[in-house]
């Protein structure tokens, strides 16, 4: 009887470990990317909360006229 309980405990630990590995591999987070070019601003994989929206709203595409070289 003790061997059966020991075997059940090992199986339970293995099943829980496999479930944990699968669930963590399914939850992949991509980094937030804000790409600013001369023509546009692209937002990729970003969580759009109020703070992020306010920050993005003030961005403008890069232009040579606004750049200053000293």
Swiss-Prot record:
Pfam families: TGBp3. Signal peptide: none annotated. Keywords: Host endoplasmic reticulum, Host membrane, Membrane, Transmembrane, Transmembrane helix, Transport, Viral movement protein. It comes from the Viruses. Residues 28-70 are cytoplasmic. InterPro entries: TGBp3. GO terms for cellular component: host cell endoplasmic reticulum membrane; membrane. The chain crosses the membrane at residues 7-27. It is found in: Host endoplasmic reticulum membrane. One of its GO terms (biological process) is transport of virus in host, cell to cell. Residues 1-6 are lumenal. TGBp1, TGBp2 and TGBp3 seem to act together for cell-to-cell propagation. TGBp1 is the main movement protein that physically cross the plasmodesma with the viral genome. TGBp2 and TGBp3 would facilitate TGBp1 function. Belongs to the Tymovirales TGBp3 protein family. Plays a role in viral cell-to-cell propagation, by facilitating genome transport to neighboring plant cells through plasmosdesmata. May induce the formation of granular vesicles derived from the Endoplasmic reticulum, which align on actin filaments. This is Movement protein TGBp3. It comes from Potato virus X.
């Amino acid at each position: 009887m003790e061997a059966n309980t020991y075997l059940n405990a090992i199986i339970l630990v293995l099943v829980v470990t496999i479930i944990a590995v699968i669930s963590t591999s399914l939850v992949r987070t991509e980094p937030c990317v804000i790409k600013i070019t001369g023509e546009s601003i692209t937002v990729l994989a970003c969580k759009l909360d109020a703070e992020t929206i306010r920050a993005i709203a003030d961005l403008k595409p890069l232009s040579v006229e606004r750049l200053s070289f000293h």
